[in-house]
């Protein structure tokens, strides 16, 4: 992943919160009575102490109890969720305590709030790299995909998308497993129909998945990702132009992605971005056009008809960026 893309996709849908101390996707919109808030505060203080495994173990035991009521499951999952949100050391202890498997089991619970607390607790745990492997080994991927598809609340679905993003960052095998489990069509749907937060989360997750496993690019194209990406690129008010452009560039690395982009009218969108976009947008649009033109005379003719030759000629200028100079060498036919 190049440095521009790393910066652009470094978050999971949050522009105003530090992911080391807060949930990186949907905000924690819970409200508590004074008594409940005081209890949570005592829990956080006790778990921050040196010998803090006792409270965590009690919460895990509560989740695992076959006699646990819905209320007790809500409370235990919520407290683990908040501890993982606020306490970096607590994330490691929770992951090592055996909490992941019972939290995963909550994703199929009938109660929407139990499910949401479970999803968000897993999301907060996944901030810690050590917990990613634990979650994958615990079989969290498929339940998270099911939550992304059918969780009762939008927050749970968006947080499931973010958790899948975190797991896909573990390695290429995990990224392929997330794609194989059926996450990509659901993320494309979230990209099309979600709110502003959901769209950003979906784009970030898709970019990571498509960068981490080549087969995921084909899955994204087959799921219809190109059309909503072009729509977002054409809408400055979306706040998604850069993210969508970088994700599209990832997809046009495949023949299927290039074909879908041309079929959906993407050449004109890219040419317009070259003409009126920011410097970063111009650069990624030119790189995508060059990728589309590579070894395809028909596409080169279409690009020329859209008026893209002048900006491509600019590749030969001394002030061209290093990336574009590299592509100039690769696609020297445009000199």
Locations of regions flagged by a protein language model:
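Hydrophobic, ordered structural segments
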Residues: 143, 165-168
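Buried hydrophobic core positions in alpha-solenoid tandem helical repeats
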Residues: 59-60, 102-104, 143-146, 186-188, ...
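Recurring C-terminal helix/loop segment of individual leucine-rich repeat
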Residues: 92, 133, 146, 173-176, ...
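Eukaryotic helix-linker segments that join adjacent hydrophobic helices
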Residues: 94-146
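N-terminal "cap/leader" segments of large eukaryotic alpha-helical scaffolds
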Residues: 1-85, 90-93
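Alpha-helical solenoid repeats of the armadillo/HEAT superfamily
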Residues: 68-80, 111-124, 134-138, 152-166, ...
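Structural recognition of alpha-solenoid helical scaffolds
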Residues: 55-58, 98-102, 139-140, 173, ...
């Amino acid at each position: 992943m190049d440095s521009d893309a790393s910066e652009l996709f470094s978050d999971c849908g949050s522009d105003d919160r530090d992911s080391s101390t807060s949930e990186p996707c949907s905000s924690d919109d819970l409200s508590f009575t004074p008594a409940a808030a005081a209890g949570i505060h005592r829990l956080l203080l006790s778990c921050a102490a040196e010998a803090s495994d006792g409270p965590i173990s009690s919460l895990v035991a509560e989740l695992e109890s076959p006699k646990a009521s819905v209320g007790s499951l809500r409370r235990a999952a919520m407290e683990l969720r908040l501890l993982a949100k606020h306490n970096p050391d607590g994330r490691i202890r929770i992951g090592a305590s055996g909490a992941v498997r019972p939290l995963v089991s909550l994703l199929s619970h009938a109660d929407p709030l139990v499910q949401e607390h479970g999803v968000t607790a897993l999301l907060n745990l996944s901030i810690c790299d050590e917990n990613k492997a634990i979650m994958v080994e615990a079989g969290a991927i498929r339940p998270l995909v099911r939550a992304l598809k059918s969780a009762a609340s939008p927050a749970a679905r968006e947080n499931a998308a973010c958790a899948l993003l975190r797991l896909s960052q573990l390695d290429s095998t995990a990224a392929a497993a997330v794609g194989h489990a059926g996450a990509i069509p659901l993320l494309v749907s979230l990209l099309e129909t979600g709110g502003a937060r959901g769209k950003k989360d979906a784009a970030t997750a898709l970019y990571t998945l498509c960068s981490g496993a080549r087969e995921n690019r084909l899955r994204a194209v087959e799921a219809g990702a190109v059309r909503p990406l072009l729509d977002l690129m054409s809408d400055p008010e979306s706040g998604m132009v850069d993210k969508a452009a970088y994700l599209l560039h990832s997809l046009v690395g495949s023949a299927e992605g290039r074909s879908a982009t041309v079929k959906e009218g993407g050449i004109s969108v890219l040419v317009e971005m070259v003409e009126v976009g920011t410097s970063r947008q111009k650069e990624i649009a030119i790189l995508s056009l060059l990728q589309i033109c590579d070894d395809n005379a028909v596409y080169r003719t279409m690009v020329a008809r859209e008026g893209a030759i002048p900006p491509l000629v600019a590749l030969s200028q001394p002030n061209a960026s290093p990336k574009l100079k590299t592509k100039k060498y690769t696609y020297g036919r445009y000199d």
